[in-house]
């Protein structure tokens, strides 16, 4: 049963540079259909949450370049609740702004924070875990979802739970410590230990609770945000444009979670979470032929294996190549070693250095 004071905050300000050349400033990863499912990633995120949080209680923070496209894709989310941040200031100011807004709209607001561009393979199980986190937030706790690690990943932060924590129970336990992204050797130790979980970037709290946390641990930003008028005030947008860029550029993890003493976590079993962080991740999610090729285009392949192809309506012929990413758009083509998928963002940096703004 959905509660009327449950809200969802979707963070949708990322650029998705590792998905170049599909992901661009005005068509970032979160508004793309990457071939997994029938809708775009942000549409899927909103649809997934609907049994607990209907669209009218969804709020989205994004950037000025992609806001209009998000409004177009999500007609059931009130347009005034899709807000473009005036500057990039990481997750602590963004969440603080959302908490200020929600507390002015509903003093009893409890909200979950969700990335806009992740895949969830088992939505039903996911919602059960989300409900458990919301129940903890009702008790003025800060709740996080920890995902049971499936391999020793070095690209995620980890959450340390008490030894003996059992995954999959729909209850929360105190979080011992947040760990930074580890080296491979340490990541292997985390997985073997059995009580370290991936930090999936999903958090739950009362608006009042996280505002208290910001006042205690990030007072400069909290003071700036508290100077804003209530949401809906005629000067609200102008004041946000002036105040928000002055906030500290820091994540909510560093600003509050690592310092707070009221953080609990749900030690989640496998609900099919995937942050879809690169073209390689898409390759892993899609069906593959007998030679391990995955393609969104018509494919002719000979003596070729392990390739990912996304070239629209074109027929793509592969001959004697392996483990490539091939992505074709009207003005750019990416050909990359699939093992270097995490480095595709470096191409965007190179284009920025060359001032090829039309390509980013």
Task: Spell out what each predicted region is.
Residues 42, 98, 117, 159, ...:
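Residue-level signal for inorganic ion chemistry
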